[in-house]
Amino acid sequence: MLEVAISDIQAREILDSRGYPTLYVKVITDAGTFGEACVPSGASTGIKEALELRDHDTSRYQGKGVLQALNNVKEVLLPVVQGVNIFDQILIDSIMVEADGTPNKEKLGANAILGISLAAAKAAAATLGQPFYRYVGGCFSHVLPCPMMNLINGGMHANNGLQFQEFMIRPIGATSIKEAVRMGADVFHTLKKLLNDKNLATGVGDEGGFAPQLKSNSEALDLLVLAIEKSGFQPGKEISLALDCAASSFYDTKTKTYEGKSYQEQVEILADLCDRYPIDSIEDGLAEEDFDGWDLLTAELGDAIQIVGDDLFVTNPELIAEGISKGRANAVLIKPNQIGTLTETSEAIQLAHNQGYTTILSHRSGETEDTTIADLAVAFNTGQIKTGSLSRSERIAKYNRLMAIEEELGPVGLFKDSNPFSGE
């Protein structure tokens, strides 16, 4: 193995797309090459996610500073990975996990560990003169993912009364990422005009989608279908719909109800929406610990649409394995900062793929200009990606990166939607 060692790590506190602090990390090798990473942050988080370390010092950034995590990068993690071969990703990650010593990385912070993990991999890629996706995935990484584009924001991503968090479109009729982006942009701008015509607000939420005051989830879906049609596309054939319910955010753990409704009623609501709209994917339709609800949802809809677990799995290989053994869901959302290292992210994806579950690489609501997830989606051939709407530069950066990768790959690149229920 080529020997190039980690010589230094630089880090600083920066701001994410919501104006809250996060970490920037730069890993430098003794060959003079380097890699950089900015760590994202979520708003609706699963209770079993790896811990994002915050300062809780109310005199700075309303307690959301990350100076403790920053200090851990410089004073704790740098000394233990300094001198380690930059190409030994598994060793780098395992050293950091061992240094933390907790199941959820609460001692040093998943944000500190992930920043180094990703920046180290990028430094390795730079040392070899390879694109990041090629270094991570190897010569068989060539699939451009179908995007899930969050055009209407609700839930914890917007203050507009909508129960569900994300109302998305999927350009399943596209033949390239370039065409998929164009289709999404057309629908986005058509939707904006429709909202203006109805005197509805066109301000956007955390992920760049519109956040109008609407009366129901159905009204949001009606608007999306109309926008698709007025853009000249066929709903369900060229562009399908997808939901992220983020059901844990409106689940009462004491009464075990969803705003007064049982899990059976919640599943009925979702099944009815699937009957009335061209929905082929639902994420977090039930709360993360409502296992009876998940079992029923998968039994009722698992043969018809993609059932995605986010909070259910939190990119944790152990939880994914448990869910697969119980037959819960049929797809896994992948967020590297939920687990905290590139190695564990890879393990989660490979486990899901080996068991026939699809995967979707995903951003967080608090993002930066970092485009890592675009490369990872191609590296792991996930075939699907969630990276927000067609506005806000931290979202657009990922689409622009995907189009650049597509151009680099040329005829080898394959735009492929991994959702087996697309267009049904």
UniProtKB/Swiss-Prot annotation:
<feature type="binding site">
    <location>
        <position position="365"/>
    </location>
    <ligand>
        <name>(2R)-2-phosphoglycerate</name>
    </ligand>
</feature>
<keyword id="KW-0324">Glycolysis</keyword>
<dbReference type="InterPro" id="IPR029017">
    <property type="entry name" value="Enolase-like_N"/>
</dbReference>
<keyword id="KW-0460">Magnesium</keyword>
<keyword id="KW-0963">Cytoplasm</keyword>
<dbReference type="GO" id="GO:0004634">
    <property type="term" value="F:phosphopyruvate hydratase activity"/>
</dbReference>
<dbReference type="Pfam" id="PF00113">
    <property type="entry name" value="Enolase_C"/>
</dbReference>
<comment type="pathway">
    <text>Carbohydrate degradation; glycolysis; pyruvate from D-glyceraldehyde 3-phosphate: step 4/5.</text>
</comment>
<dbReference type="GO" id="GO:0000287">
    <property type="term" value="F:magnesium ion binding"/>
</dbReference>
<feature type="binding site">
    <location>
        <position position="310"/>
    </location>
    <ligand>
        <name>Mg(2+)</name>
    </ligand>
</feature>
<feature type="active site" description="Proton acceptor">
    <location>
        <position position="335"/>
    </location>
</feature>
<dbReference type="GO" id="GO:0005576">
    <property type="term" value="C:extracellular region"/>
</dbReference>
<comment type="similarity">
    <text>Belongs to the enolase family.</text>
</comment>
<feature type="binding site">
    <location>
        <position position="364"/>
    </location>
    <ligand>
        <name>(2R)-2-phosphoglycerate</name>
    </ligand>
</feature>
<feature type="active site" description="Proton donor">
    <location>
        <position position="207"/>
    </location>
</feature>
<feature type="binding site">
    <location>
        <position position="283"/>
    </location>
    <ligand>
        <name>Mg(2+)</name>
    </ligand>
</feature>
<dbReference type="InterPro" id="IPR000941">
    <property type="entry name" value="Enolase"/>
</dbReference>
<keyword id="KW-0964">Secreted</keyword>
<feature type="binding site">
    <location>
        <position position="386"/>
    </location>
    <ligand>
        <name>(2R)-2-phosphoglycerate</name>
    </ligand>
</feature>
<dbReference type="GO" id="GO:0000015">
    <property type="term" value="C:phosphopyruvate hydratase complex"/>
</dbReference>
<dbReference type="InterPro" id="IPR020811">
    <property type="entry name" value="Enolase_N"/>
</dbReference>
<comment type="function">
    <text>Catalyzes the reversible conversion of 2-phosphoglycerate (2-PG) into phosphoenolpyruvate (PEP). It is essential for the degradation of carbohydrates via glycolysis.</text>
</comment>
<keyword id="KW-0479">Metal-binding</keyword>
<feature type="binding site">
    <location>
        <position position="335"/>
    </location>
    <ligand>
        <name>(2R)-2-phosphoglycerate</name>
    </ligand>
</feature>
<dbReference type="Pfam" id="PF03952">
    <property type="entry name" value="Enolase_N"/>
</dbReference>
<dbReference type="InterPro" id="IPR036849">
    <property type="entry name" value="Enolase-like_C_sf"/>
</dbReference>
<dbReference type="InterPro" id="IPR020810">
    <property type="entry name" value="Enolase_C"/>
</dbReference>
<dbReference type="InterPro" id="IPR020809">
    <property type="entry name" value="Enolase_CS"/>
</dbReference>
<keyword id="KW-0456">Lyase</keyword>
<feature type="binding site">
    <location>
        <position position="244"/>
    </location>
    <ligand>
        <name>Mg(2+)</name>
    </ligand>
</feature>
<dbReference type="GO" id="GO:0009986">
    <property type="term" value="C:cell surface"/>
</dbReference>
<dbReference type="GO" id="GO:0006096">
    <property type="term" value="P:glycolytic process"/>
</dbReference>
<protein>
    <recommendedName>
        <fullName>Enolase</fullName>
        <ecNumber>4.2.1.11</ecNumber>
    </recommendedName>
</protein>
<feature type="binding site">
    <location>
        <position position="165"/>
    </location>
    <ligand>
        <name>(2R)-2-phosphoglycerate</name>
    </ligand>
</feature>
